[in-house]
């Protein structure tokens, strides 16, 4: 690309403070207004050069800087805090301090808000300091090291050892990596072109080569590599050309122009512009490497998901096509499939046109019961708005819907309001019934305790036997009523709960066919016949207690228990008994019972189980008394029993049909531990002809050969104890040895895993007397064995029978001899309770021990992990300390080696200089001795001795006394020769031509400096630099006597002493550069020096509004 290069400003005329201020203000305005078209006109050209080349700041820019609006808006965008937009300088300074950036100016002074607000005079240093702080915050925000490494990793490989340490190092790392990639591409086509790398970001940026190569990598068409000037020894013109390429590219090919410099700002780069360079490179990085937004990752679904063989995706325009088809087709012309029935039923599901996105796309077959159940559940809880809308379409037609008048919405709202009202009524009824249930439960408890109190006062044997036998019969009735729920859902739920006990239902059985129910009305009539018969002892007993309970009768009549509460104990699972046939106690009720049994063969709703006494008390189902009749005779019909069933052998009744002596049926947890007097044993009746069992009788399981093993399941025993309100009763009898009752025998109960681990015995055995001695119980208590007792046991009892035979073979038999105590004993299962308590205690101890062991183990593991972590950290710290010590030791050794080399170099150079002087003195003179070299110490000794021995002559100056006469100390005679000081004028002249002022652009400055040096008669010249980067500031001469440098040209102090100098340089004419020398004293080997920062005077730019500036 060929374009004319404008004239550059001479280096002595360039003012870095003006360039810094202009670049900083431009960056601040561009940060606030990212697009140039949004920038106000007064701020767009707020900083310009006048005709004389001086910068001028517009009053609008000064006002915006002093009121803090520009700073606040820039800080709001950098820190992403919108609240800062309306704040002032104080808020910006506070947020910068919180961010860890101190705003300092003039050394180490903090910038105050008053300095920024003041406009006359305009405090330029304070404003530059806050702009630099904002640049630093912007750099930290957009140039994190990880982001730069990630961006470079997308182009080339990055080694872990190459990762930068800070943001500035990251920018240098990014530029060098891209330059290496460009070099690889260019070398394939042209091997003569050499793409350089940047060793120092600020020194190597002036030639513009690396930045142009960077632009070529990202925009090869806008910045061709052939247009870039690559030259190892680049001249000032080459640097200016590359920088103008960079400026034009940023102005025309980038969305936001980040180049806010003048060409001289980068060509004569000063330290004050380093932060501006950082901000410029950061903006380039953001535009070339924008942040990558990660694509959203779909979170995997947790839990069961519907099985889909094809992905479910919406069919485009599916609903629109259906709507168009419906609108275009008239009702009378529609096919039958489009004509919905006029009467919409609740059981009809939603239309197929309604979106079913929540359902599976692959329909599968379902059982009819599930479909019916789901339909019945949905019809009361789902409002089908589609069917409502279709109903209105049929009535008013499609045309009315097109002319929408709000009737459809009003109808939908009315339907919803009606549904909400019904729901509120149901919730109110449920709340009221729940409250009534609690109240009735408390009253039922009170009635029960009152009845128990009266029962405990009566100790006669007949009453107890009467209660006992009546309770046994009601237990059998309870078993039938417990299965009287009737509905499929309730029955299936109970069957599932019963099937969870292995002793009740065995695997492989089809148990629903074996279950039968008892009509509830017949049971209620039989129960009522116990109480209302005029000849029962119960009526006689109740008449005696009538007077004592008259006051409580009115109150107790309102304390009836609800049927739902009375069924709580019935709904706790299947009771493990064989099937029973309930007998009618009185022949007068036989015909009525027979009619009820024939009418109610199907499923009947559950009725309350229990009866009411004449006093008004309610007798629960498990505590109702049975009246005992001794002489009542009734002749049954031939071949028929008292319950209307075919007559079979009834071991519990005599020929007259009267009930035998009182018996007790073990239902939940009452042991069969009763005896009957021998004089009350009924005579053995001849066996009658066995008839087929009644198919309407209740069967819990399929038939079994052995019906003597009757046992309840353990969970049901515990539940029955809990429903007895904690009340047990017992009649004393002589002590006897009773083996422990076996609670269960299949050893398949569920235990805690801690018990299985810590307990030696996996299953506790508790022996039951009724299980170990079934034949004895059948012989002693024939009235307890009901009809078909042996035909209704589950086949899974074979295992229990085998265990019972084993127990009988070991001699665990109960004493069947009668005792003197009449009646029977009601045991509260103390032995079983103690065993269960013992087992529970052992479980608690085992759980506690396991918990403690687990806690200790966990604690030990944590301590072990902590120790391992501390050990690893200690080892890592030790390795790091060793590395630091090794690096420090290497550094010290390196410094010592360098110092040793420097001292050796100085010694050799001094000897060489002294030898040259001696050879010059002895030129042209013959002598017998060869020339020898004296050291500096010998020369000083000779000088001192000559001063002491030789007296001062008149007219001789003190300066002449300082000249050493080495010949006086010589053993031979030599001629006197005055020492000639060596001059570095030629070296300084070479440095000015090739190092300090290279190129044609600096001819005028170079010639003027050389002319001033030629006019001086001094022998040794020194060049003043700004810092270690060897930026020219002035030319000085060295006074050897006073060790003072005196200025003859350029900038800087008039005189400089050694105390003012911080570094000294020596010029290498071959390499054409200056080298820093580690010394603090001036000597003949020094060619340049730099002074401390506090001795530099900063030029003040006059305010644009001051009269002095206007005069210029």
Swiss-Prot record:
Gene3D superfamilies: Calponin-like domain, CKK domain. Its main location: other. Residues 324-358, 485-504, 542-566, 788-834, 916-965 are annotated as: Disordered. Disulfide bonds: none annotated. Residues 165-286 form the Calponin-homology (CH) domain. Disruption phenotype: Viable with no gross morphological defects, but exhibit uncoordinated locomotion and body positioning. Small reduction in the density of microtubule bundles along the length of the body. Fewer microtubules in the axons of PLM and ALM neurons. Defective touch neuron morphology with ectopic neurites extending from the cell bodies of ALM neurons. Residues 542-557, 956-965 have a biased composition (Low complexity). Residues 802-816 have a biased composition (Basic and acidic residues). GO terms for biological process: cytoplasmic microtubule organization; negative regulation of microtubule depolymerization; nematode larval development. Residues 345-358, 489-504, 935-951 have a biased composition (Polar residues). Required for microtubule stability and anchorage by binding to the minus ends of microtubules. Acts redundantly with noca-1 to control circumferential microtubule assembly along the body which is necessary for larval development, viability, morphology and integrity of the epidermis. Promotes microtubule stability and polymerization in neurons. Involved in the maintenance of neurite morphology in ALM and PLM neurons. May play a role in synaptic protein localization in the PLM neuron. May act upstream of dlk-1 in neuronal regeneration. Interacts with dapk-1. This is Patronin (microtubule-binding protein) homolog.
